[in-house]
Regions:
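Amphipathic alpha-helical segments in structured regions that serve as interaction surfaces
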Residues: 2-22, 29-34
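Basic, alpha-helical nucleic-acid-binding regions used in initiation and control of genome expression
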Residues: 44-48
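A short beta-strand micro-motif
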Residues: 49-55
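SH3/SH3-like beta-barrel fold
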Residues: 51, 87-92
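Short, ordered coil/turn segments that flank beta-strands lining enzyme active or ligand-binding pockets
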Residues: 56, 93
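Acidic, low-complexity, intrinsically disordered interaction modules
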Residues: 59, 64-74, 78-80
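Structured surface patches comprising rigid loops and adjacent beta-strands/short helices at the edges
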Residues: 72-73, 94-109
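Short aromatic-glycine-enriched beta-strand elements
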Residues: 80-88
Length: 109
C-alpha cells in the first residue's frame, strides 16, 4: 500500500482555495500554498521567521513573525479565532498580534 503524500494534498487543497477565493492562477496559488506550508512548519519549530505579504491596500508589509499560539492566552476577545484563510502571528518588531490572508503571502526568509 502506497503512503499518501500529505504535504502535496495540503498544498493542493490550499491552492484551490486561493484559486477560488483570490482568483490567483494555479501556478501562483501552488507557490503561495507551499510558502504557507513552509511558514507553518518553521513556526511550529519555535523559530522566528521573516515574512513579507501584500496588505489589502496594496502595500507590502515586512515582519518578523513568531507563533501566536504561545501568547494567545493573553488575548481577550470573543473566543473566535482568525478564519482558516487568515494566518495569525505575533509581530516582534511592532510587539503586537497581527494576521494576514494566506493568499497574500509573498516571501518567507
Amino acid at each position: 500500500m502506497k503512503k499518501k503524500n500529505s504535504k502535496t494534498k495540503a498544498a493542493m487543497t490550499l491552492a484551490w482555495g486561493f484559486v477560488r477565493e483570490a482568483g490567483l492562477p494555479l501556478g501562483e496559488a501552488m507557490h503561495r500554498a507551499y510558502l504557507n506550508i513552509a511558514l507553518d512548519a518553521r513556526l511550529k519549530l519555535g523559530q522566528s521567521v521573516e515574512i513579507a505579504y501584500r496588505k489589502a491596500d496594496g502595500t507590502i508589509r515586512e515582519a518578523i513573525a513568531v507563533a501566536a499560539r504561545a501568547g494567545q492566552d493573553l488575548v481577550k476577545g470573543t473566543g473566535h479565532g482568525a478564519p482558516d484563510r487568515n494566518y495569525l502571528y505575533f509581530d516582534v518588531g511592532k510587539n503586537e498580534f497581527r494576521c494576514f490572508c494566506k493568499a497574500r503571502l509573498l516571501v518567507v526568509l
